[in-house]
């Protein structure tokens, strides 16, 4: 356990909000849920999710020699919302620099420290939303949270989730990493990263029980009905999928239902009671530029490709591309026009 504890402490020193370790094994139960989801075609046009499934379920096939999974969480909750918070909205995770680059850089530092501590060149793999890895499943296995009804990982440090002193003791025993959250922030606005290590490390936590209870705020709030049932999302109806991954026409959808979201969507997270524990992130690279903060409705409608490249040069918004974002802007604008006509009738 000494090395495991040391890794968690080093992760904390590097600025990660939580860290946990689990043994590399087959995700049998999780694979059943994924297969059922795929059978329904709810992945939409994300065909990459149907490939390399064996590697997705068994990390040892993805990175030969892997014995332990180190999972880290990094807070991205912003200090302020872009624009007026009502029109032409961007998901909070994309306010600043591309999280893939930021997290991988920090995780390389963690790996270098582990290699220095062990005296071994480990040749480990770093994954940040860029390979067939069931990220949230491993975060749960590492004791860093539970999956909410909105399918997001909800990080719940011991002090936030335990309701009674006896429960405090029980969760501390189950989940010793819980108390290591730097600022005791919780909720779902976290990036997830993984180190696949060829080291046999002691596990530092166990899966937490689901704590959604009878709350259905996320399901009730989804304007497109993407959350058909608890813990299940139909990507084909999801605003995030439609504005980022989907490349076709949005003509068959109701622009008003998109509620002003032009890249991604945070509705099911914003309404989650656990996100009252969110705290503003302190990562300089996640802060939006002054140019982005100054953008308003007319600016978005007149957006040029040159302006797009300036605003989102190192941003995750590049995944949608200029043409994709323009499509979304025009689609949302058509809804505003429709609403204006309706109000004047």
Segments predicted by a language model, with ranges:
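Auxiliary alpha/beta "docking" domains used to position bulky ligands
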Residues: 1-211, 250
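Generic recognition of stable, solvent-exposed alpha-helical segments in well-folded globular domains
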Residues: 2, 6, 105, 109, ...
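Iron-sulfur cluster-binding cysteine motifs and their immediate structural context
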Residues: 13, 26, 217-241, 258-285
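Short, flexible, mixed-charge acidic loops at enzyme active sites
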Residues: 82-87, 235, 302-305
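Structural motif
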Residues: 244-250
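Alpha-helical scaffold domains
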Residues: 250-345
């Amino acid at each position: 356990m000494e090395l495991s504890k040391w890794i968690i402490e080093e992760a904390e020193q590097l600025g990660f909000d939580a860290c946990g370790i689990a043994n590399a094994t087959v995700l049998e139960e999780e694979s059943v849920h994924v297969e059922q989801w795929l059978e329904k075609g709810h992945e939409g046009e994300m065909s990459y999710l149907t490939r390399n499934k064996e590697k997705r379920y068994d990390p040892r096939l993805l990175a030969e020699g892997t014995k332990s999974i180190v999972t880290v969480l990094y807070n991205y909750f912003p200090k302020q919302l872009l624009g007026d918070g009502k029109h032409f909205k961007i998901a909070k995770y994309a306010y600043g620099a591309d999280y893939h680059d930021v997290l991988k850089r920090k995780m390389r530092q963690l790996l270098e420290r582990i290699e220095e501590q062990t005296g071994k060149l480990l040749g480990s793999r770093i994954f940040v939303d860029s390979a067939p890895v069931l990220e949230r499943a491993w975060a749960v296995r590492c004791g860093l949270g539970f999956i909410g009804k909105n399918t997001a990982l909800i990080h719940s440090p011991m002090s936030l989730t335990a309701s009674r002193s006896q429960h405090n003791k029980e969760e501390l025993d189950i989940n010793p990493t819980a108390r290591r959250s730097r600022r005791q922030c919780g909720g779902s606005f976290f990036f997830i990263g993984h180190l696949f290590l060829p080291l046999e490390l002691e596990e530092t936590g166990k899966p937490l029980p689901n704590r959604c209870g009878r709350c259905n705020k996320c399901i009730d709030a989804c304007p497109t009905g993407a959350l058909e049932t608890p813990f299940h999302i139909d990507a084909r109806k999801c605003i995030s999928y439609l504005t980022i991954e989907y490349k076709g026409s949005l003509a068959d959808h109701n622009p008003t239902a998109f509620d002003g979201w032009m890249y991604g969507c945070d509705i099911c997270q914003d309404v989650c009671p656990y996100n009252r524990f969110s705290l503003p992130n302190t990562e300089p690279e996640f802060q939006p530029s002054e140019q982005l903060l100054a953008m308003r409705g007319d600016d978005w409608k007149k957006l040029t490709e040159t302006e797009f490249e300036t605003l989102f040069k190192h941003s995750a918004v590049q995944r949608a591309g200029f043409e994709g974002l323009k499509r979304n802007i025009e689609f949302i604008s058509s809804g505003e026009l429709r609403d204006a006509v309706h109000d004047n009738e």
